[in-house]
Structure formats: structure tokens, C-alpha cells
């Protein structure tokens, strides 16, 4: 896998402080520490994307958006809520109020690694989501990953 960036993996529980700042998990700083884009994610989470991954996704959506109304609408919502961030010397980023409202983020949050991106979740929402999805985990794998051998 030479040339590929390390995957973002794991589950972390940082806090969002009174100023809206959150410390990036130390293991994510090599991929996100030079800058990242925060954007509205699916299921009311916030995506934390390395710049290159954000550009790749936005470019793919833009290629289909001109003639596809749903793609245009998705692109508008996705890009209008996207914010580029530079972590400070302590590895903290400001989570904008708009995104905190979107994902119902208070001080207790969860950051999960999802391969090429991280996701920022309300702690209670994540725990409920995970509990619900873990029940059908094996069934989902059969449908989504039919060619992957474990």
C-alpha cells in the first residue's frame, strides 16, 4: 500500500470546550493536522476530511451535478456547510456553531475514524446509532461486502 495515506481508525471521546474548540485525536493529527475540511455528514454527523479527500469528493459530485438536480442540491448543501480549518498548536479546531447545531453537538462528542475521513458525532446519538447497527452487522456485511473475504 505504498503511497496511500494511513487510514483513520478507532473511536475517541474528546470534548468541545465553551469556545467551540475540540482537540483532534492524536492518532489523526498526521492526516488532519495540516488542515482539514469540516462538512455536514450523513445521519447528522460532521465529516472531518483531509483537504485531498474533500477535493476528491467535491470533484466527483461536481462532475455529475450539472445535469442532475439531486446532485446539484446535494452539492449546494454539502459545500455551503463546509469550512476549512487549521488546527492550532495544541491540535484543536473550532467546530463552527452551524455544524454544532446541525449535529446537535454539546461538550460530549465522539470522533470515529472511517478510513479516509473521520466523523464527529453527538455522543448519545452515536451510541444509539451503534447499538442499532451492531445488531444487524453480520447481515449488512453480507449485502455490502459480498466480495470481501475476512
From Swiss-Prot:
Transport is among the record's keywords: no
InterPro entries listed in its UniProt record: MraZ (IPR003444), MraZ_C (IPR035644), MraZ_dom (IPR020603), MraZ_N (IPR035642), MraZ_sf (IPR038619), SpoVT-AbrB_dom (IPR007159), SpoVT-AbrB_sf (IPR037914)
Domain SpoVT-AbrB: 11-53, 82-125
Compartments in which it is found: Cytoplasm, Nucleoid
Keywords, sorted A to Z: Cytoplasm, DNA-binding, Repeat, Transcription, Transcription regulation
Gene Ontology CC terms, in alphabetical order: cytoplasm; nucleoid
GO biological process: negative regulation of DNA-templated transcription initiation
Any Pfam family: MraZ
Keyword Ribosomal protein carried by entry: no
One GO molecular-function entry: DNA-binding transcription factor activity
Subunit-level organization: Forms oligomers.
PANTHER family: TRANSCRIPTIONAL REGULATOR MRAZ (PTHR34701:SF1)
Family the UniProt entry places it in: Belongs to the MraZ family.
The protein, known as: Transcriptional regulator MraZ
Upper lineage: Bacteria, Bacillati, Actinomycetota, Actinomycetes, Bifidobacteriales
Gene name linked to the record: mraZ
